[in-house]
Amino acid sequence: MMVIRPVERSDVSALMQLASKTGDGLTSLPANEATLSARIERAIKTWQGELPKSEQGYVFVLEDSETGTVPGICAIEVAVGLNDPWYNYRVGTLVHASKELNVYNALPTLFLSNDHTGSSELCTLFLDPDWRKEGNGYLLSKSRFMFMAAFRDKFNDKVVAEMRGVIDEHGYSPFWQSLGKRFFSMDFSRADFLCGTGQKAFIAELMPKHPIYTHFLSQEAQDVIGQVHPQTAPARAVLEKEGFRYRNYIDIFDGGPTLECDIDRVRAIRKSRLVEVAEGQPAQGDFPACLVANENYHHFRVVLARTDPATERLILTAAQLDALKCHAGDRVRLVRLCAEEKTA
């Protein structure tokens, strides 16, 4: 059975294996054991209540409960930009006009922004390609909403998610090549690695401070502004079905879109509800796949189960209860996947 749980120190080798499969552009999952170990420690200290809000971050893994295999990771940063500035570009417009010459030009322009400072961030979503089946991706991505719904007071009113931009298999980013490289004088993969390992001072030191007309970029770079890596398209679709939208903010490195949503308008958070759980044999029928989560902060668990999403009493097998670390009579959080999201 596939189950979501908090990360543990013993997961570092599994996370290293996942990091080796991501390719360039997933900044928050670098193939660096010291960085990943520090990330795990920060998550553990977050759960233990030892960190200020500016440093808090939760990390979860997807585990096969039968084999112990860990094929996926996802995370939530509680409040971005309160220690180190959180940069992106806002894609806006500057108008240049002359009535005398009968000229009017509205020019797309990039403005350096810290507008999302303090927002909670969905990040570090990666699922091993061999495990992208049977609803694992939905479970991995949406489990975070179940945690946020259960512990709403831990998070801020706005949630953002940076989507990986267009980068080819050789690490070539058209947006970086046309813009970032001119200021940073390094390859995309190097800048991405430095940022992922916490060495972010160079961003503030070298970033262009003035607005940039997108027409000055190559056509190839202009074409990928706000576009996602092909492997990231499904993740974007999942978030958009939950209510996230692109509001003209993009990543400063690869030009990928930043999606955002008010936390209380996220579908899975808004529609999830608590029901009593009982042990037994679930009723047979053509029921939709639903997310089921316990309400245990330190031992949080989420699984997928086929059931009636409107039920007031959820029947689960002994194995499902064990995976959720629940007992008959406990209350669990329940919400169905979106109607079009299939798990078979």
Curated annotation (Swiss-Prot):
Its EC number is 2.3.1.109. Succinyl-CoA binds at L125. The active site is at H229 (proton donor). Pathway: Amino-acid degradation; L-arginine degradation via AST pathway; L-glutamate and succinate from L-arginine: step 1/5. It is an enzyme of class 2 (transferase). The keyword Hydrolase does not apply. GO terms for biological process: arginine catabolic process to glutamate; arginine catabolic process to succinate. One of its GO terms (molecular function) is arginine N-succinyltransferase activity. It catalyses: succinyl-CoA + L-arginine = N(2)-succinyl-L-arginine + CoA + H(+). Keywords: Acyltransferase, Arginine metabolism, Transferase. Disulfide bonds: none annotated. Catalyzes the transfer of succinyl-CoA to arginine to produce N(2)-succinylarginine. NCBIfam families: arg_catab_AOST, arg_catab_AstA, PRK10456.1. Belongs to the arginine N-succinyltransferase family. This is Arginine N-succinyltransferase. The lineage of its organism: Bacteria, Pseudomonadati, Pseudomonadota, Gammaproteobacteria, Enterobacterales. The gene is astA.
